[in-house]
């Protein structure tokens, strides 16, 4: 029998202000990778993390 998929998946968090902010330290978009339990957290994650491109703490949203 085949083994079932685990509940944990790898997701990518992207800075929401890097796309719109023109006055930032360096060009580009900051991304973090992390894992989440798809059974406990079905909605998309939103975490406040440090963005080195914007040089401050910003909201990072889960992307596909």
UniProtKB/Swiss-Prot annotation:
User: Any keyword Ribosomal protein?
Assistant: yes
Annotated keywords: Ribonucleoprotein, Ribosomal protein
A cellular component annotation (GO) from this entry: cytoplasm
Swiss-Prot/TrEMBL GO biological process terms: translation
A Pfam entry, by short name: Ribosomal_L33
Highest taxon, organism lineage: Bacteria
Q: GO MF terms on file? A: structural constituent of ribosome
Ranges annotated as spanning the membrane = none
What does the similarity note say?
Belongs to the bacterial ribosomal protein bL33 family.
PANTHER family linked to this entry: 50S RIBOSOMAL PROTEIN L33, CHLOROPLASTIC, LARGE RIBOSOMAL SUBUNIT PROTEIN BL33C
What is the protein's given name?
Large ribosomal subunit protein bL33
The protein's organism comes out as: Synechococcus sp. (strain JA-3-3Ab)
């Amino acid at each position: 029998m085949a083994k079932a998929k685990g509940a944990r998946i790898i997701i990518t968090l992207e800075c929401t202000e890097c796309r719109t902010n023109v006055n930032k330290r360096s060009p580009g978009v900051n991304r973090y990778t992390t894992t989440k339990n798809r059974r406990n957290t079905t909605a998309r994650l939103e975490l406040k993390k440090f963005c080195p491109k914007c040089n401050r703490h910003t909201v990072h949203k889960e992307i596909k």
